[in-house]
Curated annotation (Swiss-Prot):
It comes from Methanobacterium formicicum. Keywords: Cytoplasm, Glycolysis, NAD, NADP, Oxidoreductase. Disulfide bonds: none annotated. InterPro entries: DapB_N, GlycerAld/Erythrose_P_DH, GlycerAld_3-P_DH_AS, GlycerAld_3-P_DH_cat, GlycerAld_3-P_DH_NAD(P)-bd, Glyceraldehyde-3-P_DH_2_arc, NAD(P)-bd_dom_sf. This is Glyceraldehyde-3-phosphate dehydrogenase. SUPFAM superfamilies: Glyceraldehyde-3-phosphate dehydrogenase-like, C-terminal domain, NAD(P)-binding Rossmann-fold domains. One of its GO terms (cellular component) is cytoplasm.
Amino acid sequence: MKSVGINGYGTIGKRVADAVSAQDDMKIVGVTKRSPDFEARMAVEKGYDLYISAPERENSFEEAGIKVTGTAEELFEKLDIVVDCTPEGIGAKNKEGTYEKMGLKATFQGGEKHDQIGLSFNSFSNYKDVIGKDYARVVSCNTTGLCRTLNPINDLCGIKKVRAVMVRRGADPSQVKKGPINAIVPNPPTVPSHHGPDVQTVMYDLNITTMALLVPTTLMHQHNLMVELESSVSIDDIKDKLNETPRVLLLKAKEGLGSTAEFMEYAKELGRSRNDLFEIGVWEESLNIVDGELYYMQAIHQESDVVPENVDAIRAMLEMEDNPSKSIEKTNKAMGIL
């Protein structure tokens, strides 16, 4: 049973904590928070030992009546690996300032720069390259979504080139200080966007160009993909391949699943905690091949799709499982992923 800690119990951190707790080969030793907010209180209520990453704020936790077990550094000393879920840019500083000095393995989130961490990870793309490594960055929610569907297509028939238009949510549901509220924003206004190069950190030889925009919604990201195929296949071949791929769902608009809002309603009907949809939802009706080019649309629940990949990264880095398919299957079974 490997000992895991979560540095940053927020949107991703709290989900990874629950995912790790569901496994039978790893456990959560503790989680960290900087502020005595409702998430800190609920972490303690759920039974997680809470450590503070800002020791000077200990009094504020005491005043709020939130039990603190110790400091983040004290937590790190007890761990085999830490999952860093701190805000963008903080993880790289933690790597250099704390983890390397302590000799502590760490996974990071997609907000960190690949070059600063040195290695990126996706369960389906480069699991074996991360086995035994000290530091790895789980690629972003958008990149994870692209890899989930492009990998099986590449395995089936090969890919010449990918072009993708990313329609990104403006903010997470709880983020009241972000937007846009009444605009469509090219983000970035330059082409290509960073998503293509991010995919190439795990699918090394893929020819991919992306562009992205922000829209006033909070529920999910949406992708529109155009994929030039190397060999001839039918739509049924593509459907069969995606249907057999873990963490991918073919969903039908004609069954009332024609929007991201309805995808989220589907997650509720699955009985998921926090309404999470770990799987990438592909609109089955969007699949089409024209002159050797595959077209399809998919949606990504940005708060949760990277969570199972964090669990797989732990197994790879701690050399708990060298077969990616076995780790994926084990993670999925424990988390109830389809």
